[in-house]
Amino acid sequence: YALISKKYIYIFLENPKLSKKIVSLFSKKVEILSFLELETKLKKLNIKGEKILKDIKYISKYYHDIIRKSYKKLIYEDDPILNFKAIKNNIEIRNMVKAHILDGVALTKFIYWFKNFNAVITELDIVNKIDALRSQNKNFLCKSFPTIAGSGKNGAIVHYIPNKITNRKLNKNDILLLDSGGQYKLGTTDVTRTLSIGKPEENHTVSYTQVLKSHIKLSNAIFPEGISGAYLDYLARSKLWEIGKDYAHGTGHGVGYCLNVHEGPFSISKNSNIALKEGMVFSNEPGYYIENKFGIRIENLVTIKKKILNKKDFFKIETLTLAPYDVDLITKSLLTNEELIWIKNYHNTVFKKISPYLDKNEKSWLFKEINKL
């Protein structure tokens, strides 16, 4: 916890003993205390009749009761700081664009390696490789979450994280669901690509293309002010609902700026009722899963931009993530001409932004890959 007054900042930790190096980073007005001292500090705030705002969703009953007994003027509202974080300013958006170029380079290099690797490979090999490629960048701080690398039946487990016990060798004609991301000095990334080995089965390519159509549907969304994430969730799912398919997770979540990769207060899900605003960043990640068979998910991070239509304010989606889709998994006949054009334009942007940072072989491969369609 942190308690901030006009004069001091108190940080409460389970273990308040920090190294001298960390303590030296703080101002003299920052005091490190034990969790056990939080109750005492709350009771001695001496706010003198000021009102206290509490967000009941994010406070434990224990501390709620302490504050309620100590202070009479309480207001129950949503935490306004959550909206400050959710709506990125222009500098944060510009930096996140740069972070996604760095991340896109690492992921594209990984995909090239994965597609051209001929030896036996395991899920943990994949985790180690993508983590190593990201860490080569001087702006990289750490992973934004544990890497999800599920092959075959493990891909059907939405948040599967391989370990020494579950680690699986990839077989010929498997598909891999790779969901990973990084924390950079310029922002946070989160991206999923589903990749094939060898010649994919028809069920793989058809399902992948159907998920891609949902992904594109959301990417092209245009909507007026006041619309919540529930509407965008419906837009994405509608392409799968038309063919009797669905997925048992939200279509997207808010993403922080060098903060939590899952950030509120809004989401792109069936029950989200918070109005979307310009500058919000969230994931676009529809999927399809068959238990004990395979999993498919395609994820880009996107942001909301203003668009004037008929002299009125509307919003559009701008994609931040830069990494190629697996063209080997696309059934071209299932795509409309507009969807094909969208993929082509996206891949052209990927090549323009990413290819300057690739070596000769990687660049040649990427050019051929995106032009297969």
Question: Which sequence ranges carry the predicted segments?
Answer:
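Active-site neighborhoods and metal-handling regions in enzymes and metal-associated proteins
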Residues: 1-373
